[in-house]
Structures are given as structure tokens and as C-alpha cells.
Amino acid sequence: MKASEWIDISQPLNNEIATWPGDTPFSYEVSCTKEQSGSVNIGKVTMSIHTGTHIDAPFHFDNDGKKVIDLDIHVYVGPARIIDVSSMDSIGVKELQQFNLEGVERLLLRTSSHGNAQKFPDIIPFLCAEIAPFLSKKGVRLIGVDVPSVDPLDDKELAAHHQLFQHGIHILENVVLDHVQDGDYELIALPLALTEADGSPVRAIIRPL
């Protein structure tokens, strides 16, 4: 692969992809065929916003929070650093202090804890809320993880979600990082222009810097 080539770090969306328990399953179907319309196939998608690779908006966990359309799109495009935290059950300040994060605006964490997009995990590594001010001081504006949430799966308080956004750090979840090395990349992970949404699917791609 050439250094200038883009690498897809998104979960493919198909009818077999795992969803949060009790959430809307992903479904794609051709609702009108070329034979029926006389000219084109027309597809229909039904899904939860939080299926596959996606971003969270504050409205996801705060009724008064910003919706997707209100978010700064510049946050989702630019230099990013991938680091490996695969040996950690939880990621706090102590765990992150071993990495050089000065000036890093977008940080992607490889936990390598769950590589099967067709099965929802039973347990995931999670982010400790204490990392929000620590990362903010470093200059981080976006954090990405290769799991469905930055908080424990059964957590209702969502302390990491709240603290990250309170410190100006946006959230990207369910990226796929097992096939890429640690290092610095250019990231594009733009959300859709959804005016009322609490999150958005993204096509996340990177290329080495």
C-alpha cells in the first residue's frame, strides 16, 4: 500500500452487523426495483444512529445538548494519532501518561478487545472520566475507540461521555484499527448533516502522514 493511499477504518454496514441489545437492527432492502420503476433500483435503510462506526452528539446523553448539525465539522478532519492500549481493561490518566500526546488533536485508541462486528461484545475496555481534563490540556479535540462506547456497556451515568464533551472532546466509536499500525495519520470521519440527530454514522478513513 502506498503511503498516500486512504485506509478504511469503518465497520461495513450490512444486515448481519451487531447492534446494541434492544436497539433497531440494521436493514437494507431494495424497496423498488428497476423493473418496477422502469429506470432505477431504489434502496431503503432502517437503522439505529449508533450502529457501526459513528459519532455521538451531546444530545445523545443530554436533552439540552448540541445535535449533529451543531457540531464543528473541522474536528472530524485532520491529523490523528493511533496508540495501542490493548493490554488495558480501563484507560485512565496513568495509562495514557506513557504516551507522547502533546499537540495531538485527534486520538484513536486501539483496544483490540472485540474484532467481530457481527456480535455485540459482552464487556469492553472503557475510558475513565478523569482523562477528559488531561486530554483537553494536551490539545485533544476528538477521541476514537474501536468499541461501541467510551463508557462501560451497562453504565447509565455515562461519566466519560459527559466529561469528554464538557472539556470540548468529541466522540467517535466503533472504528476498526486492527489492520493499521500505531502512528500519525490524516483522518476524515465526517458525520451526515442531520439536523435533529443525537449521532451519525460516518465513513472513517485515514492515510499515513
Swiss-Prot record:
* Active site, renumbered: H60 (proton donor/acceptor)
Q: Where does substrate bind?
A: W20
Q: How is the cofactor bound?
A: Binds 2 zinc ions per subunit.
What are the binding positions for Zn(2+) 1 in this chain?
H50, H54, D56, E173
Q: Specify the superkingdom.
A: Bacteria
Tell me its EC number(s), please.
3.5.1.9
Q: Which PANTHER family match?
A: CYCLASE-LIKE PROTEIN 2, KYNURENINE FORMAMIDASE
Its name, as the record gives it, is Kynurenine formamidase
